[in-house]
């Protein structure tokens, strides 16, 4: 993002509490979050007719806030007509991902609950977007995979924060394990198909003998093999860190995210997915579902469920895209995001919002008018005047 147009700050805050059982090694452990805030340097000089926009990006499992950096300048420059302007952008690392994982090392437990992750997002977003000097704005949440799940969960938990949800193949319903299983195992117990677990282990290595082995693996053996070259380089540069206890250049390298925490993102899903599945029906916001045409990451029931259950659902299929379409074909996804934001802004009641400075007496008059209007809509005539 252009440095003269936006100021970048990296911040740290405490994660939401209390959390799901076993989310930390000890009950007294407290987790932290690291996130980036991009604030417009031009926000005070904006035209009153331009809609102000805040964007919150949520990454998928095994990723981090860095996967979205490629998007930022291309989203900022999208509206040449001046219908809207971006005020703030938030990029968040979940507690066991990226820079947050580094801060929480030694405290993370075996239960990474995506609902807790949504609560973390809400804590940051309400703080950053709801400050007393904030102007009326449209808040848009954009989430991929796990982040799409969490975007939906955010609207369930706090339905008045986000105005538009853009979901890039959110993972809500997953494939069930087919096999002997364990007799009597409750359906909401942690479980993962063994073949999926083994495949994930090969794609989520976290320790390497040296820099060369690290780069070779990230380019040829990780989930990001087919990622856009710039995004892949951003990931390589961001995830690299020295192995514990090694301060020498040329020594062992590790990723910021531990492999075990990466695997836990998938192993725990059956324990918290039922909550969202039961509550998606209450999401009323316009919800854009972007999905790659050739993705087979989720079973067909995932898309069918969202299409049937969400009240304001819009499907947008990216030709040739996979589940990782956000990192493999980012320009196509950016084009669709810009289109949906532009379309939403033009029909938004906040497009020309401006709150004048009013005295207490003027506010009282304003309320009386609002109450009379509300009463006229709510009042139902009855045959008896009194109860």
Curated annotation (Swiss-Prot):
Main location class: other
GO CC, any one term: peroxisomal matrix
Chain intervals for the UniProt region annotation (Peroxisomal targeting signal type 1): 385-387
Annotated keywords: Hydrolase, Peroxisome
Molecular functions (GO terms): triacylglycerol lipase activity
Biological process terms in GO annotation: triglyceride catabolic process
Subcellular location: Peroxisome matrix
Stored InterPro entries: AB_hydrolase_1, AB_hydrolase_fold, Carboxylesterase_BioH
Any further remark recorded for this protein: Present with 2350 molecules/cell in log phase SD medium.
Protein name: Peroxisomal membrane protein LPX1
Primary gene name: LPX1
């Amino acid at each position: 993002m252009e440095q003269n147009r936006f100021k970048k700050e990296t911040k740290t805050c405490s994660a939401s509490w209390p959390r799901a059982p076993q989310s930390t090694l000890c009950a007294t452990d407290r987790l932290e979050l690291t996130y980036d805030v991009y604030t417009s340097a031009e926000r005070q000089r904006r035209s009153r007719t331009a809609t102000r926009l805040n964007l919150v990006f949520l990454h998928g499992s095994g990723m981090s806030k860095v996967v979205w950096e490629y998007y930022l300048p291309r989203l900022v420059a999208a509206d040449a007509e001046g219908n809207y302007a971006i005020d703030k952008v938030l990029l968040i690392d979940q507690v066991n991902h990226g820079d947050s994982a580094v801060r929480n090392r030694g405290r993370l437990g075996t239960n990474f609950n995506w609902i807790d992750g949504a609560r973390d997002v809400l804590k940051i977003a309400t703080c950053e977007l709801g400050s007393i000097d904030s102007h009326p704005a449209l808040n848009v949440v954009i989430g991929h995979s796990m982040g799409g799940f969490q975007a939906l969960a955010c609207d369930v938990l706090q339905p008045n924060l986000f105005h538009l949800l853009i979901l890039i193949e959110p993972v809500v319903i997953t494939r069930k394990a087919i096999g002997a299983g364990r007799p009597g195992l409750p359906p909401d117990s942690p479980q993962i198909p063994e073949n999926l677990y083994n495949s994930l282990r090969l794609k989520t290595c976290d320790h390497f003998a040296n820099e060369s082995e690290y780069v070779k693996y990230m380019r040829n053996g990780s989930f990001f093999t087919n990622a856009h070259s710039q995004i892949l380089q951003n990931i390589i540069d961001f995830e690299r860190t020295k192995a514990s206890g090694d301060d020498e250049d040329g020594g062992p390298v590790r990723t910021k995210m531990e492999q075990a925490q990466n695997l836990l993102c998938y192993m725990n899903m059956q324990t918290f997915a039922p909550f969202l599945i039961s509550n998606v029906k209450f999401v009323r916001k316009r919800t854009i579902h972007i999905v790659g045409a050739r993705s087979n990451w989720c079973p067909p029931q995932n898309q069918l469920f969202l299409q049937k259950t969400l009240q304001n659902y819009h499907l947008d299929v990216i030709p040739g895209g996979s589940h990782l379409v956000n990192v493999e074909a980012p320009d196509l996804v950016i084009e669709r995001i810009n289109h949906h934001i532009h379309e939403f802004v033009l029909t938004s009641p906040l497009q020309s919002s401006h709150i004048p400075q009013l005295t207490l007496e003027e506010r009282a008059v304003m309320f009386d008018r609002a109450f009379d209007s509300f009463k006229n809509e709510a009042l139902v005539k009855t045959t008896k005047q009194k109860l």
